Each structure stands twice: as C-alpha cells, then as structure tokens.
UniProtKB/Swiss-Prot annotation:
Its EC number is 4.1.2.40. The gene is gatY. HAMAP family: TagBP_aldolase_GatY. It comes from Escherichia coli O17:K52:H18 (strain UMN026 / ExPEC). This is D-tagatose-1,6-bisphosphate aldolase subunit GatY. One of its GO terms (cellular component) is cytosol. NCBIfam families: cbbA, PRK09195.1, PRK12737.1, tag_bisphos_ald. Zn(2+) binds at residues 83, 180, 208. GO terms for biological process: D-tagatose 6-phosphate catabolic process; galactitol catabolic process.
Amino acid sequence: MYVVSTKQMLNNAQRGGYAVPAFNIHNLETMQVVVETAANLHAPVIIAGTPGTFTHAGTENLLALVSAMAKQYHHPLAIHLDHHTKFDDIAQKVRSGVRSVMIDASHLPFAQNISRVKEVVDFCHRFDVSVEAELGQLGGQEDDVQVNEADALYTNPVQAREFAEATGIDSLAVAIGTAHGMYASAPVLDFSRLENIRQWVNLPLVLHGASGLSTKDIQQTIKLGICKINVATELKNAFSQALKNYLTEHPEATDPRDYLQSAKSAMRDVVSKVIADCGCEGRA
C-alpha cells in the first residue's frame, strides 16, 4: 500500500505545479532522515539508489527498509533505481519488488539509446513499473561513471519528442547545464532550452545534478516543467562534514548512535530545504 510507483507521484506533480525530490540514500541514517522529514512535512519523496548503493546495502534489505518505514510513518514512498545501465540488473531488481527505474543509456548514440531504453520499458511496463530515461549527458561523476564537462551534451528538444514517443518512457531526464557533484561556481542553466523541451514533450521532466542549485533556479525549472529533482552530493557532503566536525571536537567519541546525530541533523536541514524549494510540502 505504501510503497508506490513514481508514475502517479510525478503526474500529480505535473498537474500541481510542484516537484518531487528524489534523495539518493547511502546508509540507514540517510533513509531515516529523508523519511522522517518527509512524513513530518507530508511531502512526497523518492528514495533513490545507484547500482553502487544497491550493491552496498543489498536490494532485499533496501526494499524491506523502505516498506517498513513507509508503514511505520503511514507515508507513501517510492524506491527508485538511479542511473542503472544493465538490463539483467534492472530485471532482477524489478522482480524483487522495485517499482521505479531509470535506465541510463545516454552515453550511446541516439538510435541505440532508444533501442536500449525501449527494451527496458517493454519489460518494466509488464510489471506496472515506471521508467525514466535520459537524453543528453550531464558532466561530473555518478557512482563509477565520469563524464568530462567537454563531453556533456544538452538535450535536443526535437529529438526529445521523438525519443519519448519511440521508447514509451514515463518521465524524461534532461540536460540543461547541471552536473553531478557540487559546483565550484553557480551554473548557468539553459531555461529557454527547457521551455522548448516542455513544448515538445508532455511527460514529467527530471532534473539531475540539483545539489547546490539556488532556490531561484530550482523554482524556475519547476515553472518550466521539471517534476522531479535529484539530490545526492548535497546530502553526502552535509553528512560527512558534520561527522568530521563532531569527531574533531569530540575525539573520545566511540558510539555511532551518539556521533551520527550531528550528521543526521545536518542532513535534515538539507532535506527540509529541498522539500521547500520543490514546493511539495503538504502534497503527500
């Protein structure tokens, strides 16, 4: 009942003019903070994990945790495969109970990207699983995948329509100037390109690389059709910096139940801000 597909979440966001944040989790504490904060704010959220996260924690363990926490807080949650590339890996996780998938074949030529994505869509839709795919490429690093800034490609609006129609995807991740990781300086987002994509594609649009973006930029992308905002690095940085600071100030600390509280508090601030920026408080 409480573990849901992202399709309805994002369709509701599209109709309501807000975005749903997708938080990449890396450990139990991150998931606790995201779910507790979302439940307190009655905000829809997506629990996202890269292949590395699923390998680290175990698919069955993550599914069990999401299900248990959704029931505990009486709060609907979606668990989402972020930047997955291998069909067999996706199929295994879908059969285990995952109901939302991002197949990332954006590094392939256009026709091959379509072919790879359509194969995943055809399989996933048999299980009522929603599928996101990316057209264009973001710079930066996600898991073990590194894309140099010079190799990053913006989404072509006309191709985006062809891509969406040919694959049957449920949401489209676009490249408009964001990158994975934190920014050394404020990025310049191509809002006119995003507006053009919105005119050609009637699907919920997804923005990756949102860590460190200004509130103004995030809210402008939502006005232009973004329905899902991905955040990963900002959570990791908040966690690790707070933990380092605490252990520096308290070198005698040995109990993780104590010294992880400062890290959880720092992440809670990030999650609350992202939910506010997305305008999704009270929408769950």
